[in-house]
């Protein structure tokens, strides 16, 4: 069953965050992730406004978690820490 990686981000250091994004993209796609939304237009209806919103589809919740915990993604994430304020949730899709 598919799962989604949903991130809401405020970037505080664009240069460092760009390094994260470049490395993270490779790690995410290597784990079967497919970007569905990435910093496009959005409407903030409730909660905290974060200008960068990302949705990635993975083959399963386990694949999404494996990606997050992978050495490749953690190396990328080191560039995002201190360069952004982030909320990230992994959520399984409904059965078809």
Description of each model-found segment:
Residues 64-90:
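C-terminal structural segments of small proteins and small subunits
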Residues 1-52, 59-69, 92-96:
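Short S/T/G/P-rich N-terminal loop/turn motif that feeds into the first structured element of a domain
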């Amino acid at each position: 069953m598919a799962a989604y990686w949903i991130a809401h981000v405020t970037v505080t250091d664009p240069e460092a965050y760009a390094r994260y994004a470049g490395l993270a993209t490779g790690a995410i796609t290597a784990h079967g992730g497919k970007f569905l939304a990435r910093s496009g237009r959005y409407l903030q209806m409730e909660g905290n406004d974060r200008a960068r919103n990302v949705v990635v589809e993975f083959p399963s919740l386990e694949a999404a978690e494996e990606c997050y915990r992978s050495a490749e993604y953690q190396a990328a994430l080191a560039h995002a820490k201190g360069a952004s304020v982030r909320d990230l949730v992994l959520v399984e899709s409904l059965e078809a």
